[in-house]
């Protein structure tokens, strides 16, 4: 399902970067969920080719991994389950029933729990026990239906956002309880986390409904300190009209904590901002397509981002073009476009340890993103 098919047949695309990047290991893989297909593509970032497919999963959304790289966790919107796969074989281990319809997921640093955003019903945060693969509890969010959730790099909190309640939420991971919330004026979508020198959370950068840019949240002060709008373009790209309420969807902080990358659907680009000063340092144009009878070029519809552990490459899922763009972050250009499945949504980086004895303990999570 490309944007061409969306425009020609008016087929609505499913909606829609953040798992931690391990510090060192022998093999890196980029996982991409195909939200309108029935598979997950696994990319080798050395060859930039798909080297594995996890098949027979419809409704794949968020994706994360166990620290030892043995399991792949996927939130399944079709069955309202957390699907657990064997990483090597791609075979399903178990479908864990959740409290309601899920969205994004994240994993604790030691891998003992998987946290799942619940986007329907009463909402809240589901906690899945990784040892028993059962739903441990649901933490209420004062009626908030959560969209994206992320375990903070210091493993102390889970941060999340709600689109309908327009609220930024924080949960205490040790107590497994609601901590605090901050009302916003727009729906809260994708997030990225900037850390202090000690690994604690400094700022959260959050993309918002109807904002072609992002909000800046001071975590300690519990307040919004800035709002950044992405640069304008002479003419916006066509995106089929189905993502007008989420123009900026896909955001991430590089593993070295020095650069923030932000995508734009109408601008069809990814922008780089230096940290901590948030100065614009570059723009990368994403793939586009020309269709007869349409005045504008078609946007790739950037959806989510993830990095290689060294931060040299950025992978952008193009949900409108069944592909993933590989961006050289130093050269500021797309170096490869990799075909994947239908409406690629979330992507994530996995580093497989050298041996079974080497834990793939994630380095501080720098990125989070999109719907």
Language-model features: locations:
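Cationic, low-complexity basic patches in intrinsically disordered or flexible, solvent-exposed regions
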Residues: 9
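Short Lys/Arg-enriched helix C-cap and helix-to-coil transition segments
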Residues: 1
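Predominantly soluble domains enriched in secretory-pathway, periplasmic, or organellar proteins
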Residues: 4-5, 14, 18-371
């Amino acid at each position: 399902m490309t944007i061409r098919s969306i425009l020609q047949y008016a087929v609505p695309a499913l909606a829609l970067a953040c798992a931690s990047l391990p510090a060192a290991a022998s093999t890196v893989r980029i996982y991409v969920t195909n939200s309108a297909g029935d598979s997950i593509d696994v990319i080798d970032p050395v060859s930039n080719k798909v080297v594995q497919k996890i098949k027979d999963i419809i409704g794949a959304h968020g994706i994360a991994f166990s620290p030892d790289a043995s399991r792949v966790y996927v939130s399944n919107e079709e069955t309202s389950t957390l699907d657990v796969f064997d990483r090597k074989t791609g075979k399903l281990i178990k479908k864990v029933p959740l409290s309601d319809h899920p969205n994004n997921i994240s994993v604790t640093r030691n891998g003992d729990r998987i946290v799942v955003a619940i986007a329907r019903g009463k909402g809240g945060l589901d906690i899945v026990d990784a040892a028993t693969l059962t739903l441990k509890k649901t933490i209420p969010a004062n009626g908030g239906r959560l969209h994206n959730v992320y375990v903070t790099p210091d493993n102390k909190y889970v941060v999340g956002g709600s689109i309908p309640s327009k609220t930024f939420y924080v949960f205490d991971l040790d107590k497994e309880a609601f901590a605090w919330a901050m009302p916003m004026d727009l729906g809260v979508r994708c997030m990225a986390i900037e850390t202090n020198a000690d690994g604690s959370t400094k700022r959260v950068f959050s993309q918002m409904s109807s904002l072609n840019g992002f909000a800046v949240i001071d975590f300690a002060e519990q307040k919004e300190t800035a709002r950044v709008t992405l640069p304008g373009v002479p003419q916006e790209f066509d995106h089929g009209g189905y993502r007008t309420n989420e123009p900026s969807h896909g955001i991430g902080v590089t593993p070295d904590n020095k650069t923030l990358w932000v995508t734009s659907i109408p601008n069809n680009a990814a922008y780089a901002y230096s940290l901590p000063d948030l100065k614009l340092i570059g723009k990368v144009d994403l793939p586009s397509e020309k269709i007869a009878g349409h005045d504008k070029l078609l946007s790739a519809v950037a959806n989510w981002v993830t990095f290689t552990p060294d931060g040299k490459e950025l992978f952008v899922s193009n949900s409108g073009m069944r592909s993933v763009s590989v961006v050289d972050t130093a050269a500021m250009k797309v170096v490869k476009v990799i075909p994947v499945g239908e409406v690629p949504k979330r992507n994530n980086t996995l580093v497989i340890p050298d041996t079974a004895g080497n834990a793939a303990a994630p380095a501080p999570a720098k990125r989070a993103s999109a719907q």
